[in-house]
């Protein structure tokens, strides 16, 4: 299967109505295909049952997921549903946001280490989103795990909607950093919609991943499910058990809604 790349055209903003269906989405097939993604400016989003349900009632979010360059299946439910409904894409496995993060960071670390041996400048990775406290923890851990990378951060204002001035400040900060890898972490669907809406204003030439929860996982402020739960497709159940008050609606009601949406497809 070829990498699920829609194309690297910067002109992503499209006012046409999107008919959002899992059956017709182009989704990356396996973790191995991450190595085949083209270089340059590339928008990488994730999809799971929750984000699918949200996109069904949020037109801009649906456009962001449909018109991005790469869509990865961050949920066993997506993998199984694609098989069940005989979708165009047949992903072989779940690719978590953490898998994307680890792959991209390790790749950039190797490239940066090689540059450092030649006395050249380090590669730059930028984290845009979350609180300054979390970002400080990210910088500290990155220095230990990825010592050859230069880490730049930006914590946007904590508000439901950014003003035009806020957006300009964020965009200017990203463009000034000119990163070799950019992570956007503001939770879904805000992070996907913001990145998609301002894509043409980002004068950068790197992979851009929207991976909200990974910021907290890497910083250590939120515990990720143990490996056994991940390998058996039960990370959602682990999160539900850890945070039942916050997660019950997303997983109990949300998973039922996702199943119903698949029946309708």
Regions inferred by a protein language model and the residue ranges of each:
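Proline-aspartate-enriched helix->loop->beta-strand connector
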Residues: 174-183, 187-188, 195
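Short, flexible loop segments at boundaries between secondary-structure elements
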Residues: 156-161, 204-241
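A transmembrane-helix-recognition feature enriched in membrane-embedded lipid enzymes
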Residues: 79-80, 224-265
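Conserved beta-alpha
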Residues: 85-112, 122-173, 177-178
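Short Gly/Thr/Asp-enriched flexible loops that form oxyanion-binding sites at enzyme active sites
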Residues: 139, 192-201
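Short, basic, low-complexity termini and linkers enriched in Ser/Thr/Gly/Pro
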Residues: 1-5, 9-15, 110-122
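Short glycine-rich anion-binding loops that position phosphate/pyrophosphate groups of nucleotides
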Residues: 49-52, 186-191, 214
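N-terminal nucleotide/polyanion-binding subdomain common to many enzyme families
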Residues: 3-7, 12-101
């Amino acid at each position: 299967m070829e990498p699920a790349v829609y194309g690297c055209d910067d002109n992503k903003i499209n006012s046409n109505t999107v008919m959002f269906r899992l059956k017709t989405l182009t989704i990356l097939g396996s973790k191995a295909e991450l190595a085949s993604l083209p270089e340059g400016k590339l928008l990488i989003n994730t999809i799971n049952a929750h984000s699918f349900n949200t996109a069904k009632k949020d037109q801009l979010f649906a456009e962001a997921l449909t018109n991005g360059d790469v869509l990865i299946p961050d949920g066993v439910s997506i993998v199984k549903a694609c098989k069940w409904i005989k979708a165009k894409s047949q992903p072989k496995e779940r690719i978590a946001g953490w898998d994307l993060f680890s792959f991209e960071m390790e790749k950039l670390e190797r490239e940066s280490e090689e540059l450092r041996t030649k006395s050249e400048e380090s590669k730059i990775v930028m984290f845009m989103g979350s609180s300054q406290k979390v970002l400080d923890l990210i910088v500290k851990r990155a220095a230990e795990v990825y010592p050859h990378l230069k880490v730049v951060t930006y914590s946007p204002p904590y508000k439901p909607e950014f003003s035009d001035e806020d957006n300009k400040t964020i965009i200017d900060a990203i463009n000034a950093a000119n990163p070799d890898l950019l992570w956007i972490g503001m939770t879904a669907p805000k992070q996907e919609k913001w990145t998609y809406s301002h894509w043409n204003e980002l004068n950068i030439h790197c992979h851009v991943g929207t991976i909200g929860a990974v910021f907290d996982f890497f910083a250590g402020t939120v515990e990720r499910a143990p490996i056994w739960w991940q390998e058996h497709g039960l990370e959602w159940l682990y999160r539900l058990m850890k945070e039942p008050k916050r997660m019950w609606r997303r997983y109990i009601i949300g998973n039922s809604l996702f199943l119903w949406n698949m029946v309708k497809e």
